[in-house]
Amino acid sequence: MALNGQLCRFCAIFSRGSSTTIPWAVYALAMNTNPPAVLVTGSGRGLGKGVALELARSGMSVAIHYGANDAAAQATAEECAEMAPNPAQLFPLLKADLYEASGRDGLIDQALLVLGRLDALVNNAGITSPGRADVLENTEAAWDEVMDVNLKAPWFISQKAARWWVEHPGESRLEGGFKLVFVSSVSAEMASMNRGDYCISKAGIGMMARVFALRLAAHGTQVVEFRPGIMETDMTAGVKEKYDPIINGGKVPMRRWGQPSDVGRAVRSFLKGDLPFCTGEAIYLDGGLHLPLL
C-alpha cells in the first residue's frame, strides 16, 4: 500500500492549491487504473467517511472531498489506503467550499483530473439549520446558507457529472452503468419546527433524485436517494444524552443509533450493482424511525 500512501500525500498537497504540476507517471496511473472511480462529497468525516471507507474496502478509488478540516480528511484517506485491496486504488483529497460557485463548479473537473474518470457521484455534503431557529424566526441569511449547500451544490455538481456520463456512454466500470447517489435524511419526510429550512432542503433532494433518474435512465445511469435517520457521528456527540432515551424508548423500532457504516454499506451495495432495476427511489436507513405507529 506504499504507492497508495504516496498518491494520497501528493494529492493532498495538490488539493490545497499547490502550483506543482502532476507528474506524468502519476497522472498516467490515474488515467489507466482499473478500479471504478467515485467522488464522495463531504467525506472527510461523518457519514461521508463511512461511505468512503466501505467503497475503499470494496476495491474502488475514492476522491475524498472536504471543506475545511485538513487533518480529518487526511486521516480518512490514510484509512482508505490501509484497507484497499487493490494497489491501483487512489484516494485523492479535494478541498472545495460548496458555499461558493467556484468551489462547486470545479469539483467534478478536479475529480476527473486526479482519477482520470468518474463512475459514480455520491452527494453527501450538507449542513443543518444555522441556529436551529423556529419557523417564525428563521432568517433569509440562514435559508440561503442551507439551500446553497444542501440543494444548489448537489444540483450543479450532479449536472456536471451527468454531462460527462452522457458523453461517455457504455464506459462505466460499475455493473449496470454509472451511478448517482444522494444522501438525504428522514427530514425529507419528517418535519422539525426548528429546522424548517433544513427539512425543506432535504425534501428537495427527493425530487432532485427523481428528475435526474428520469433524465439519465436512457443513458445507462441509475439514481437513488438514501434517507438516514438518527446517526451516531462526531457531529451528533453533543446530543447523545438527548437521543439515547428516545431511541431506547422505541421511537426507533430497531432501538439503536445508525452508524456511518450503515450508510456506507448501502451505497456500496448500490454501486456494486445489487439493485439493477431500481432508479429514482428513496430508501430509508433509519431503523424504522419514519414508519407510522398507531
Task: Annotate each language-model stretch with its function.
Residues 185:
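Residue(s) in the substrate-gating loop at a strand-loop-helix junction
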Residues 122, 217-222, 278-280:
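Short, small/polar-rich loop/turn modules that mediate ligand/substrate recognition or access, typified
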Residues 132, 250, 268, 279-294:
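Short C-terminal tail/terminal secondary-structure segment
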Residues 158, 201-204, 209:
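Active-site helix of classical SDR
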